[in-house]
Amino acid sequence: MALLEICCYSMECALTAQRNGADRIELCAAPKEGGLTPSFGVLRSVREHITIPIHPIIRPRGGDFYYTDGEFAAMLEDIRLVRELGFPGLVTGVLTVDGDVDMSRMEKIMAAAGPLAVTFHRAFDMCANPFNALKNLADAGVARVLTSGQKADAAQGLSIIMELIAQGDAPIIMAGAGVRANNLQNFLDAGVREVHSSAGVLLPSPMRYRNQGLSMSADIQADEYSRYRVEGAAVAEMKGIIVRHQAK
């Protein structure tokens, strides 16, 4: 049966995902940055209260995936922490300035991760040649690749995702970016073994007093009075589609 991974940005999100049938959680901070490394407090509390597998993301900042030596050193320390806390896997990705997988740094990541399953995230979609990148990641021992098929969303990139799947069984190709109940069946019919979804909504903050003339963000257009939450009904609907597909 296809596996359903849900991207979560808090304990509340993780609990909702677990209750509604998620098989695995990608744990992140900073949704507006596309996901950054969670804090120690979030890592430990989620590890203690969630029973399904959790793979934290290791990403020190938003933007591109070419990191300074200092940023990369911090990534290795975060990987060691995730390993010490007993997580079964992690999510990360590093590129060269030319858009190739940085194999030298991936070797260090794999060594630091040890027995943990490593997912190479959507840095893959920023690679110059996805097929060369997939071969390099297979050689590195990466467990899976999260990809939208190098398009804005996975529905647009489905043909490339299918080509990547045809390259072999490892790494597992996990489709993500815009995967929802209304298009999930297309991915299942295409033979995708794992799907990744945010299943999220923005809810209004409960704050009653709001200083509309002041922002805590460098982006003055950012809505600071909304909060990201996983929508339980969306997770349950997707899991139901997967179960029914398996029963055919």
UniProtKB/Swiss-Prot annotation:
How does the record describe its quaternary structure?
Homodimer.
| SUPFAM superfamilies for the chain | CutC-like
InterPro entries, per the entry: CutC-like (IPR005627), CutC-like_dom_sf (IPR036822)
Main localization, broad class: cytoplasm
Q: Which Gene3D superfamilies match?
A: Copper homeostasis (CutC) domain
Q: State a single Gene Ontology molecular function.
A: copper ion binding
Keyword vocabulary terms for this entry: Cytoplasm
* Any one GO CC term of the record: cytoplasm
Subcellular compartments: Cytoplasm
Species source reads Salmonella newport (strain SL254)
HAMAP family found in the cross-reference section: CutC
Q: What family does this chain come from, according to its entry? A: Belongs to the CutC family.
What name goes with this protein? PF03932 family protein CutC
